[in-house]
C-alpha cells in the first residue's frame, strides 16, 4: 500500500494551477492508494459545482466550489486516466476569503465517510475550529487531520482533539487497519507533548519503522504558524493503529 499526506496550503501563494504539476506527476507515477490533504482551500465566493465526479459528501452546508483544490486535483488526475473517489470537510474560514478544509482521496471504492468534530469551537468563522475526515474502504480506514499546537494561547487543545480522533475510530480498529494522516503541528523531537502522547497510545509512526528513509523534516523553518522557528521540523505523520512493515518513507514537497 502506498500512502501520501500533504498540507497543500493551496491557492494562498499562487492561483496558477500549473505550479501544482509536480504534485500531479508524482501521484500519476506512484499511484497512491490513499491521499490525505490539509489546508484544502476554495474561494468562498466561487461558483458551486453540482454533483462532482467521485465525491462523497459528509455535509451539505458548504458545497464544493469551482476552485476547490481537491476537486482540481481529482480532475487533473482523471484527465490523465487516474480516477480517485474523494471527500472534503470544511473546517473554518481561511485568510478571510477561503473555505479551508481537509480531504481524502481513495483509489478504491469508498464505503463511508464521516465528518468528526474535534475542537471545542464549532464556529466556522474561528480558526480554532478543527475537524477530522474519516473514510472507510473495504480493506482499511483513513483519517485526515490538521491538529492544533500543543499549547495555543495558553490552552492545550491538542489533548481534546486527539482524544476525539481516538473515539471516532474506536469501533473501526477492531475491524480493519486504521491510518491517521496529516499535519499534527507537534514536532517529533519534543518530548512529553503530542508526538509522545500518540505513540504512547500504541500508534505506529511510519517513519520510525521504515526500512529505508529519504528525508526527515516535513517543513522548513519559520513557515506560517511557526513564525520565529529556526529549525526544520517533522510535524506531518502517517500513524497506523497496528504494527505494519514499512518499506520506504520519503519526504516530498517539503518547501
What kind of region is each of these model predictions?
Residues 72-80, 96-113, 227-246:
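Conserved beta strand-loop-helix elements of the APE1-like EEP
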Residues 1-4, 97-102, 106-112, 127-145, ...:
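Beta-strand-turn-beta hairpins that frame and shape the catalytic cleft
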Residues 10-13, 116-124, 146-157:
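Surface-exposed cleft-lining segments at the edges of enzyme active sites
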Residues 35-38, 87, 179-183, 205-209:
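Active-site neighborhood of phospho(di)ester-bond hydrolases with catalytic His/Asp-centered motifs
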Residues 1-98:
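N-terminal, active-site-proximal structural segment of metallo-dependent hydrolase catalytic domains
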Residues 131-143, 155-191:
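His/acidic metal-ligating clusters that form di-metal
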Residues 11-13, 42-44, 94-97, 150-153, ...:
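Active-site environment of divalent metal-dependent phosphoester hydrolases
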Residues 170-178, 186-255:
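Metal-dependent phosphoester-hydrolase catalytic domains
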Amino acid at each position: 500500500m502506498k500512502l501520501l499526506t500533504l498540507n497543500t496550503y493551496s491557492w494562498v501563494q499562487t492561483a496558477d494551477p500549473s505550479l501544482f504539476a509536480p504534485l500531479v506527476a508524482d501521484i500519476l507515477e506512484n499511484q497512491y492508494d490513499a491521499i490525505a490533504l490539509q489546508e484544502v482551500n476554495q474561494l468562498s465566493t466561487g461558483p458551486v459545482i453540482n454533483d462532482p465526479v467521485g465525491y462523497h459528501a459528509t455535509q451539505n452546508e458548504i458545497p464544493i466550489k469551482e476552485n476547490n483544490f481537491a476537486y482540481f486535483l481529482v480532475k487533473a488526475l482523471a484527465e490523465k486516466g487516474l480516477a480517485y473517489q474523494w471527500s472534503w470537510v470544511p473546517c473554518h474560514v481561511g485568510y478571510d476569503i477561503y473555505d479551508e478544509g481537509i480531504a481524502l482521496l481513495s483509489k478504491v471504492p469508498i464505503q463511508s465517510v464521516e465528518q468528526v468534530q474535534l475542537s471545542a469551537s464549532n464556529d466556522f468563522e474561528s480558526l480554532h475550529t478543527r475537524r477530522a475526515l474519516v473514510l472507510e474502504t473495504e480493506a482499511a480506514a483513513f483519517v485526515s487531520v490538521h491538529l492544533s499546537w500543543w499549547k495555543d494561547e495558553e490552552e492545550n487543545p491538542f489533548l481534546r482533539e486527539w482524544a476525539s480522533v481516538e473515539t471516532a475510530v474506536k469501533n473501526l480498529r477492531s475491524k480493519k487497519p486504521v491510518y491517521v494522516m496529516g499535519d499534527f503541528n507537534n514536532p517529533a523531537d519534543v518530548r512529553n507533548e503530542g508526538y509522545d502522547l500518540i505513540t504512547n497510545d500504541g500508534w505506529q509512526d511510519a517513519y520510525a519503522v521504515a526500512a529505508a528513509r529519504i528525508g526527515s523534516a516535513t517543513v522548513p523553518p519559520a513557515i506560517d504558524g511557526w513564525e520565529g522557528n529556526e529549525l526544520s521540523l517533522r510535524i506531518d505523520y502517517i500513524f497506523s493503529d497496528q504494527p505494519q512493515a514499512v518499506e520506504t518513507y520519503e519526504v516530498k514537497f517539503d518547501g
